[in-house]
Amino acid sequence: MKIKAEIMDEKAIDRALIRIAHEIVERNKGIEDVVLVGIKTRGVPLAERIAKYISRIEGKKPPVGSLDITLYRDDLTTDLEQPLVKKKDIGVDVVGKIVVLVDDVIYTGRTIRAAMDAIIDLGRPKAIQLAELIDRGHRELPIKPDYVGKNVPTSKNEIVNVMLEEVDKVNRVVITEK
C-alpha cells in the first residue's frame, strides 16, 4: 500500500470536527433532540469526538450510539458492495430525535443507505442527518452529507484511509492506490 498523499493531519482532523460540531448545533438550534450515531469502526470515535466538542459549545453532551454495518465484499478488490446491518441495538433511542449519522468516508452511499434503513427500523426519527469526515465523491445513490470535514476528489483506483488514535494509534488521513 503506497501512500500517494497525506490530506489531513491531527490538527486538520480536529479543526474539521470542531467545525462540524458548530454546524450541528447551529443547524438544529441547539442539541435538545440531537442523537449522534457512529457507524463502526471509525465513525464511532468520530461521533464521540464531535459529542465532546458539542459539549464544550452547549455545556451538555448529546447521546452517542453505534451502528455496526458490514459489507459483503473485500473493500480492496471489488466495487460490488451489499451492506449488512450486524446489530440493531444502537444504544440510543431514535424515536422523535434528530439522528446524525457519523462516518469517516462517504463513497458510493450504500453504507449510509443501509444505516438509514436500520435507524428507521428502530423507530421514526424526526430527521436523519449525515456527517462525514471525508467526501470522496463517486456516489451511486442520491445521498449527500449535511456536514463534511473535507471534500477530496479521488479516482476509483484510489483509497482514502482515515486513521484515528482510538483505532490505529495515529490521527491522519491519507490517499493510497489499490
UniProtKB/Swiss-Prot annotation:
Question: EC number(s) on record?
Answer: 2.4.2.9
* UniProt cross-references to Pfam families, sorted A to Z: Pribosyltran
Motif (PRPP-binding) on chain: 99-111
Q: Name one GO biological process term.
A: DNA-templated transcription termination
Q: List the SUPFAM superfamilies.
A: PRTase-like
Enzyme class, top EC level, equals transferase
Q: In its keyword annotation, does this UniProt entry include Metal-binding?
A: no
Keyword Nucleus attached:
no
User: InterPro entries annotated for this entry?
Assistant: PRibTrfase_dom (IPR000836), PRTase-like (IPR029057), PyrR (IPR023050), PyrR_bifunctional (IPR050137)
Q: Which GO MF terms are attached to this record?
A: RNA binding; uracil phosphoribosyltransferase activity
Which transformation does this protein catalyse, written as a reaction? Answer: UMP + diphosphate = 5-phospho-alpha-D-ribose 1-diphosphate + uracil
Q: Which UniProt keywords apply?
A: Glycosyltransferase, RNA-binding, Transcription, Transcription regulation, Transcription termination, Transferase
Task: Name the domain of life this protein comes from.
Answer: Bacteria
Q: In which family does this protein belong, per the annotation? A: Belongs to the purine/pyrimidine phosphoribosyltransferase family. PyrR subfamily.
- Function, in words: Regulates transcriptional attenuation of the pyrimidine nucleotide (pyr) operon by binding in a uridine-dependent manner to specific sites on pyr mRNA. This disrupts an antiterminator hairpin in the RNA and favors formation of a downstream transcription terminator, leading to a reduced expression of downstream genes. Also displays a weak uracil phosphoribosyltransferase activity which is not physiologically significant.
Q: How does it assemble?
A: Homodimer and homohexamer; in equilibrium.
Specify the protein name: Bifunctional protein PyrR
The protein's organism comes out as: Thermoanaerobacter pseudethanolicus (strain ATCC 33223 / 39E)
